[in-house]
Amino acid sequence: MLGARAWLGRVLLLPRAGAGLAASRRGSSSRDKDRSATVSSSVPMPAGGKGSHPSSTPQRVPNRLIHEKSPYLLQHAYNPVDWYPWGQEAFDKARKENKPIFLSVGYSTCHWCHMMEEESFQNEEIGRLLSEDFVSVKVDREERPDVDKVYMTFVQATSSGGGWPMNVWLTPNLQPFVGGTYFPPEDGLTRVGFRTVLLRIREQWKQNKNTLLENSQRVTTALLARSEISVGDRQLPPSAATVNNRCFQQLDEGYDEEYGGFAEAPKFPTPVILSFLFSYWLSHRLTQDGSRAQQMALHTLKMMANGGIRDHVGQGFHRYSTDRQWHVPHFEKMLYDQAQLAVAYSQAFQLSGDEFYSDVAKGILQYVARSLSHRSGGFYSAEDADSPPERGQRPKEGAYYVWTVKEVQQLLPEPVLGATEPLTSGQLLMKHYGLTEAGNISPSQDPKGELQGQNVLTVRYSLELTAARFGLDVEAVRTLLNSGLEKLFQARKHRPKPHLDSKMLAAWNGLMVSGYAVTGAVLGQDRLINYATNGAKFLKRHMFDVASGRLMRTCYTGPGGTVEHSNPPCWGFLEDYAFVVRGLLDLYEASQESAWLEWALRLQDTQDKLFWDSQGGGYFCSEAELGAGLPLRLKDDQDGAEPSANSVSAHNLLRLHGFTGHKDWMDKCVCLLTAFSERMRRVPVALPEMVRALSAQQQTLKQIVICGDRQAKDTKALVQCVHSVYIPNKVLILADGDPSSFLSRQLPFLSTLRRLEDQATAYVCENQACSVPITDPCELRKLLHP
């Protein structure tokens, strides 16, 4: 919308405070650029004011955040700032005292959130300014994604990007007029310090308040128009073939041939893109583009797994790579990355049969089970990037994960027998993983000099090349490296651990249920499926209100590992319902326990009541009541680090239609896809997960029915055959012969399907017709993957 953009450009009167973004999950140009402030506003603000300095003896007096449950809010509970949580008390105070609201949004494992808390929010003078001249509100973006999305939309629309911490100044009516990300405490030659920002906004609020209010209203009006997503006068979604090809072309243009991935730096894991490429390969596998799509996805996954973005010692993946080579990561570990990447590597194994990918998937889930799992079955949110190198020292990014040559030599001094030259286990490991005496981290990736002389493990050579270099057997090298990594892992346990965000989110737990269910099904490992089952039980026991049928967004780890909730509870958002429903559908297909399918249908009904836009189509991110007062009610239109909840919902609706035959689900899916038509036509690469749903909707969904006893060996053999083949556009149904069962009541045709000669029997049904009965898993595989 050019008119809105033009207006937004006119109100940007602040000089740019820096060249890049604050620490952002969507990306930033480098660690160095992360440090620059991004500012957008309607307030003129010259650079070069007086700096401010943190107090050397901050008083440990708690503010009202001490009563919150969020780990992020509790990190600010001893700031000399009169913080309020998001809520009516803060809004009433702002209106009564006619003060602007200072809104600061972040999350507990955010590196630059820690920096700003230490540099600015612990500063006594800044604390007085924030407490006396503003109503200061602190928000955990993971608790309130609706608040985060609304004001991030403003920051991104009025500046060069966004990130966290996000700092926005609002009118008492919650309309934004100044926004930015990380601010340094002091002014620099090209950067505006936070104290200067506060003083200038205070001055402008006193002298030019009416102008600020008018500008704020115009910006809000422009954002409302710009964020409109609606069916309009369109009757149907666009052609899937056209949108698919355009999406592939856009990805192909940005693909890194050498290292994989789709950007220079920083490089983020992109599971939604990889899933799209796998689906594109399946529908174009006899074409050159199809082969290329598969190669792009598999190469990216292999380079990521070999790079430093993967924790080779403790498993799991870090948040993103600061360089093109996937070498030096931002060391934070997020639950949603582990969940989605486990699925991506499992799919890669389905496609390729290469156990390299299944081993990576198993490693991810091993990490989650060990480090991100609550004893009752739920999953924690994240581990921080920062930790003290030694107890009592100041935290540094990556300290827990990096190694010096001296450390490795001391831990692995054993000689390697049979090598063509004198060699220790440590030297073998350092050669394979690229460790050097000077450290293997470029100064450009370490602007603060915290990682000098340190090494990030990254695979430099194949096992075959390392073995050949020293005249060793490949399996012997594999054993030696695995043994060495285990010793490093045991030694690492004695280091101070990074902060664990033990908050549990329904949405991310739903993704993790999918991660365990899909991987367990593909690999035929009931142990992994049991983790998914326990996760679903946790969601139902601790994050579901039976009386209202609603999900809760959050719960927290209390003393002794107990599960606690905020009072009042934080109710679920669209993504909580969409991701949990997906997890339950995946769990049903993995376990064939119909109770999970029944719960998924009930949650989908609740989602429709709370979030569906009956006029424009698609789902709003938040309930109307919960988001009351916010200037925007948005529909998420981008598949990023997490898939858009609308994209996931489109898939869920298709699958629910396949499981039940109810036409309403299909009609809703078509309406949703139609509402996002323009976005998919223009920039399909922004919605690859929704483009997959569009393709699935315009193809024929397969209903694969297995008639048999759930626990029988022949039934399990047919089920495992289905899971071994990559078939994204299908539902797997178990028909146990009970006419009163849930699925038999939903799909009457199941009663017409019979077991052949009292054996478990498979039918592949599409377009209201079923294949001949099949009892041989090999024959079924041929039919599913000709």
Swiss-Prot record:
Organism: Homo sapiens (Human)
Region (Disordered): 23-61
Pfam families linked to this entry: Thioredox_DsbH (PF03190)
Principal cellular location given in the protein's record: secreted
This protein's record includes keyword Phosphoprotein: yes
Signal peptide (from-to): 1-22
Alphabetical UniProt keywords: Developmental protein, Differentiation, Phosphoprotein, Secreted, Signal, Spermatogenesis
Residue numbers of Phosphoserine PTMs: S649
Secreted recorded as keyword: yes
Subcellular location: Secreted
GO cellular component terms, semicolon-separated: extracellular region; mitochondrion
The protein, known as: Spermatogenesis-associated protein 20
Role, per record: May play a role in fertility regulation.
InterPro entries xrefs: 6-hairpin_glycosidase_sf (IPR008928), 6hp_glycosidase-like_sf (IPR012341), Ssp411 (IPR024705), Ssp411-like_TRX (IPR004879), Thioredoxin-like_sf (IPR036249)
One BP annotation, GO: carbohydrate metabolic process
Matches recorded under Gene3D superfamilies: 1.50.10.10, Glutaredoxin
